[in-house]
Amino acid sequence: LGDVYKRQIIISAIVHVVIGHLYPNEVYLYLAYAGLGTVLGHNFPCYLHFKGGKGIATTAGIIVGFLDPVIIVSCLIAFIVIVAITRYVSLGSITIVTMFCIEYAIFAFHGKYGFDLASAPSYHAMVESVIVVAVICGMAIVRHHANIVRLLHHEENKLGAKKAVS
C-alpha cells in the first residue's frame, strides 16, 4: 500500500511541476493518464501472467495524487462511515471509486481544475480526462464483480469476521 502512494505521489509531483509548467490547462489530463498506467500495471502485471489486484489501493493513490482536498476528505469519510456501519470493505471501496468519478466529473465540468472551458482544446482535454477517470473507476468496479455478487447474496465477508468456508 505504501509503495502505491509513494509511486503515485512521485508521478503526481512530476506531472504537476513539469507538465503544469508547460501545459497548465492539461495537468489533470496527464494525471489521469499517469493514473491509468499505474492501475493497468497493478491490475495486469506481466510478471504475474496479467493477474493482479483490483486496483482500489492504486485508485486511492490517484485520488491523493489529484491533490483535491474535497475529494480526498469526502472519499475518506465515506469509506470510514460505510465500513464502520456495514463492515464491508468491498462496499466502501466501490463507493469511493464511484464518488471519485462523479465528483471529479462535476468539478471538472465546473472549471475547477484549470481547464479553460471557453477554449475548445482545453474543453476536449477536460472531457478526455473525465473519460479516463471513468475508465479507471469502471475497472475497479468490474474487478469487484465477485464481491458485488456476494454482497447481493449476503455472502460477503465482513471486516473482523472469520471467513466463511466454501
Question: What is each PLM-predicted segment?
Answer:
Residues 31-36, 60, 72-77, 94-95, ...:
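Hydrophobic alpha-helical transmembrane segments
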Residues 1-5:
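Short, small-residue-biased leader/transition segments that mark boundaries at the very start
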Residues 15-19, 56-86, 98-108:
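Interfacial segments of multi-pass membrane proteins
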Residues 10-33, 64-71, 106-131:
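Helix-coil boundary and interhelical linker segments in multi-pass alpha-helical membrane proteins
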Residues 17-22, 33-41, 52-63:
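Short juxtamembrane and helix-loop transition motifs at transmembrane-helix boundaries
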Residues 39-50, 82-89:
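Transmembrane alpha-helix interface/packing and boundary motifs in multi-pass membrane proteins
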Residues 52, 149-166:
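Cytosolic, membrane-interface loops and tails of multi-pass inner-membrane proteins
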